[in-house]
């Protein structure tokens, strides 16, 4: 194995010798953890996050909030750390709100939630907050948040880029009020404004003016979490105007929140059951959730598996056959890499639609999936808004990740069925799924 430099290290993706049969404890949800951190930081009293995800993205969020003055105390309870606590089961973070202030520098890494959720928070701080990050973060659009905050009264220096690096000159408060944005490139633009909205003097009314809004489950997650801490939110689903969300100004409560497992990160393990004709159990799968990953139950069942919610968790079983699928993934775009990997191993073609916005994610995921699967012998074509996948006999080779955690897990799925696949920079999975290689080999009994 090449170990130097680290980012070009090759990880031999384990090949499954038979059907998997495993219980996999998936760590907490990144999306829930980072929203909860923001809401707790803006609350009027301390709160707790239990079983938070400890990964690069969430540690960046915690570090950024600390930079602005928020207290975050991390504790681990050995009595509740099941199986060593690698799933975060014994961990709890106490968040102690404080007056937000600069000067401060925030490293966003390549975390969309950090780069988009925190500029509105910084506008409430007293003093300048500078945002910087990985080179790829400079290419990811922030204009939706920047333009909206300026319209609401914030002062931001970005040299006209509409992207990082930038500085928010916080004035200690923000007027807020109505604002129109085009969030068609990322639903995080809407969530970012809603999360801080209760602290704006007039609250906020966000009107989406663009084409189809992607990843709606993530906006529903934001709304649910706001309501859980006492915010009043009017939404299109609750009888409000289409594409308009209103948050009333008011104090947020400090809560004691237990973070759900990250269902999107359960995807490779469920895919392993599907691809090998085996069985995987994911404990603590919620009966009701706004996480996009819950859609996997329906999608992977259509592709040949079956699932049941039991007292043990979600029990997913493969049939030994993998079928192609024609599916609109606009609401669950983050699942695309894993679905594409399974589709490349199917017995019939697949069409994945509604995910043009993936070109703006951690990498251009559509171009990356096309290139990497085809270099293993596949037949994938980019369409205007997705991928067309015709299964072919695949062979081994290097699967590049482009510093994208979901590309790495997609390559691992293919490696189950194709001998000789090597994943470049599997360590990028630490962005949202720490210890992925150990969880993966543990599932296989290696």
UniProtKB/Swiss-Prot annotation:
Its EC number is 2.5.1.19. Keywords: Amino-acid biosynthesis, Aromatic amino acid biosynthesis, Cytoplasm, Transferase. Gene3D superfamilies: Enolpyruvate transferase domain (3.65.10.10). 3-phosphoshikimate binds at residues 30-31, 35, 186-188, 215, 334, 361. It is found in: Cytoplasm. One of its GO terms (cellular component) is cytoplasm. Its main location: cytoplasm. Coiled coil: none annotated. GO terms for biological process: amino acid biosynthetic process; aromatic amino acid family biosynthetic process; chorismate biosynthetic process. Signal peptide: none annotated. Phosphoenolpyruvate binds at residues 30, 112, 140, 188, 365, 406, 431. InterPro entries: Enolpyruvate_Tfrase_dom, Enolpyruvate_Tfrase_sf, EPSP_synthase, EPSP_synthase_CS, RNA3'P_cycl/enolpyr_Trfase_a/b. Pathway: Metabolic intermediate biosynthesis; chorismate biosynthesis; chorismate from D-erythrose 4-phosphate and phosphoenolpyruvate: step 6/7. Belongs to the EPSP synthase family. This is 3-phosphoshikimate 1-carboxyvinyltransferase. The lineage of its organism: Bacteria, Bacillati, Actinomycetota, Actinomycetes, Kitasatosporales.
